[in-house]
Curated annotation (Swiss-Prot):
UniProt name for this protein: SsrA-binding protein
Biological role stated in the UniProt entry: Required for rescue of stalled ribosomes mediated by trans-translation. Binds to transfer-messenger RNA (tmRNA), required for stable association of tmRNA with ribosomes. tmRNA and SmpB together mimic tRNA shape, replacing the anticodon stem-loop with SmpB. tmRNA is encoded by the ssrA gene; the 2 termini fold to resemble tRNA(Ala) and it encodes a 'tag peptide', a short internal open reading frame. During trans-translation Ala-aminoacylated tmRNA acts like a tRNA, entering the A-site of stalled ribosomes, displacing the stalled mRNA.
Organism: Campylobacter hominis (strain ATCC BAA-381 / DSM 21671 / CCUG 45161 / LMG 19568 / NCTC 13146 / CH001A)
Keyword RNA-binding in annotation: yes
CDD domains, sorted: SmpB
HAMAP family attached to this UniProt entry: SmpB
InterPro entries, per database record: SmpB (IPR023620), SsrA-bd_prot (IPR000037), SsrA-bd_prot_CS (IPR020081)
Record-level GO cellular component terms: cytosol
């Protein structure tokens, strides 16, 4: 499994509740661009439209040598492929509990197919983000103190 791109902001802005794997409908030039690392999931999100799941606002740059006729839009909606039962479960959670569906990463599976890792997530408040940063900083300081103690300084 080779990770092509990752949404690091999702872990900072959301509390991840459950992960899912979804196929993604792409054109050939988009797959080439992904393999070259020309993608960004920073502000991307998923939405259910007419019973189908779409990845919105994911930026996949087109290649310069792609014919202008075949160039897909860089931020266009891309259909995600999941079982109907999973989509209905996501729809129920999003509509009832105020959750969001967030794209975490795009990767190649063992059969070299591009897959999207999406998550059911709940937004963090500002104080939750600050607590997480404080906790991370405290862990980092504790680790460095343990290393210094082990070395004998």
């Amino acid at each position: 499994m080779k990770e092509l791109t990752k949404n690091k902001k999702a872990w900072h802005n959301f509390t991840i509740i459950e992960n899912f794997e979804a196929g993604i409908v792409l054109k050939g030039s988009e797959v080439k661009a992904l393999r070259m690392g020309r993608a960004n999931l920073k502000d991307s999100f998923c939405r259910i439209i007419k019973g189908e799941l779409f990845l919105l606002n994911a930026h996949i740059s087109f290649l310069e040598n792609t014919n202008a006729f075949f160039r897909p839009s860089e931020n266009g909606a891309r259909k995600l492929l999941m079982h109907k039962k999973e989509i209905n479960r996501l729809f129920g959670a999003v509509s009832k509990e105020g959750m969001a569906i967030v794209a975490l990463s795009l990767y190649l599976n063992d059969k070299n197919k591009v897959k999207a890792r999406i998550a059911l997530a709940k937004g963090k408040n500002l104080h939750d983000k600050r607590e997480a940063l404080k906790r991370k900083e405290a862990e980092r300081e504790a680790q460095s103190a343990m290393k210094r103690y082990a070395k004998g300084y």
